[in-house]
């Protein structure tokens, strides 16, 4: 018989409290021996009935609650409820209840407008007592916005069936099976719950999970576990089919349980391992698709380990034993270490049978003396677009890294290693290995930085480097299709380099650990077929075109003009005049007293678009000259006020003449000289223009950087210095300057005066899971300088949360940090470093914060973070 709640006074208008009316209908059905209590479409508000164990609505024997469908019939907790409610709908506490349930409706916990823990569905007799609820059926029910659990059938329940239902956005677990006997969860979905999707706990046994889905939950997708009390472990659990993906921790966790089977499931994209067996016995993992897990932590796809509870409630050590992993397809992500891994903690008697394992460092890594692997197929590891760690086997194979900064290890055998794009580290291992480079972008340097691979164990007696696809024809000076060999200053690293750049400014470069300069030859480098060029065959190639020319002089002195393009000019004998013209040219004077002329700033410069400076390969300061008179430079200096600055590269192999002043097109003059000529350059070998005195006291204009790694200088006046993108260096000098490094890891020096260091975007100075990209202030003076973070919304100093910034000092006391521990949607947390210990001096007097509104400040709650994500539902 049906009992319509509206016949008992329920309104379903979303405003009135209908609890008493609905309960009256339930009681009437119970008094008549049973029936269905029907709620027509509408929103029925309910309040707490009294004690937490009273819930809101209490079902009785043979009574079923039914609505018009999920989302059509909604039972919602009233606004302002401020007490614990163990079940908006529940069975009576301490009474054995049978043949009852709920279907076709939604329970809404209204967590945004209520206080204290509220659960959606709850049933069970009483904890630790021998009674039980029986024959419970829940179908097509949605539970949402509970501050506690969604569905929480509790101890003990015999023969519960919960199917075709949904739990989402609840504060703890979506579905709990606490001491269930002989029940079934089928075709349910749990998503966006703060803790686990499904939690099978507290002595549950003979239980079936079939075709359920859990995704986007904060903890595990599905966990089977004993819980925090010393009770009998869950046993005889079947998990058949379904999907468990994109959860914060494991896809499936089996902890302190016995005889659990996980089969035919799709488990992928989870934060840690796909499946973790933790202090359990007799677990079977059969025929699953386990792939692309370890998204937020380095982990194996399947982890088998023991659980130490010697300091816990049982005092026992639970060894993982007799796990069978059979017929699974296991594919790793960039962070996946192994297909299946045992921990070296006593775990034993594991059997791996007939699995297909790909894309991991190693297919299986077992420690148990009685653990075995048979029939497992593992393809050579292949990389992704992420930062992969790929380890080969004991046979020869081809390992390709793909994009990303990869680590490749060939293991034994004659392997072929191809790191692909990115800055890769390559280890051939035992055997005669080949390191292949198919594209210039795979290992190169450019104006954007160095992206060269490093070979860690090159053996010149048997290994080979294959650069044939790049067109290099032999060893030489790094030009005209040759590769130059050079050593680091300490002799611990060898480099193979080309000095010819492609259209994107990339020059091939490869590093080898160790000193191999004397042993590298055509015997261990695979070159392309050489096409010899006779330089004497070009009689008078003196004037170039707008293309990339190679122009050769003779034994006489002549003028060689490159024109447009990235040209190569060779003077050979005689006192030559070389003028590369526009483009990034390479100039070799040869013998004789040569002059290298620069008539236009565009001939050799850098700008926001990149570096287009010429390189002089054989400048002899005792006889050669640089002619910059047409550009108006008047002498050597700091690169300002018409002077040229001299600097040397970090490795001492290249000297630069630079102006830091730009023309209307943003171009600054720069020319490079091979070798260290810093001490030898002077007015004797540089032809300057007649100097024009400059008043250094004139206040400068704003200095604006590019998206490259800029070095920007102020004047003696006050100005804004804006870095833009790139890892910039900003120098204010005197005056009250404003320095804004922009994006990139910048170094800021205000100099004299009361300077302001501004941070307008969180990306300008931050840390993230990808690394630390914080700016560093080199000379902060707390007595007069300021740090402006007002645009970022920070309101004061504090613990780094709730809009505050925390102050900390490095262990050695040489650096102070201002940090926020709150990340934005991209995972960026603000951080800036100050040289020196300023912890005691930092305050609102020298930090510009955003305006605060105390009345609008709300309390930030922490949801679902007990610190013990594997704890049971209690």
Swiss-Prot record:
Reported regulation of activity: Inhibited by zinc.
GO molecular function term, any single one: calcium ion binding
Start and stop residues of the Hemolysin-type calcium-binding repeats: 383-394, 401-417, 419-435, 562-578, 580-596, 723-739, 741-757
Keywords recorded for this protein, A-Z: Alginate biosynthesis, Calcium, Isomerase, Repeat, Secreted
EC number: 5.1.3.37
Known pathway: Glycan biosynthesis; alginate biosynthesis
InterPro entries membership: Beta_helix (IPR039448), Carb-bd_sugar_hydrolysis-dom (IPR006633), Hemolysin-typ_Ca-bd_CS (IPR018511), Hemolysn_Ca-bd (IPR001343), PbH1 (IPR006626), Pectin_lyas_fold (IPR012334), Pectin_lyase_fold/virulence (IPR011050), Peptidase_M10B_C (IPR013858)
Family: Belongs to the D-mannuronate C5-epimerase family.
PANTHER family: S-LAYER PROTEIN
Note: Each enzyme of this family of C5 epimerases introduces its own characteristic sequence distribution of G-blocks in their substrates, explaining the extensive sequence variability of alginates. These alginates of varying composition have different physical properties and are necessary at different stages of the bacterium life cycle.
Name of the molecule in the record: Mannuronan C5-epimerase AlgE6
Gene: algE6
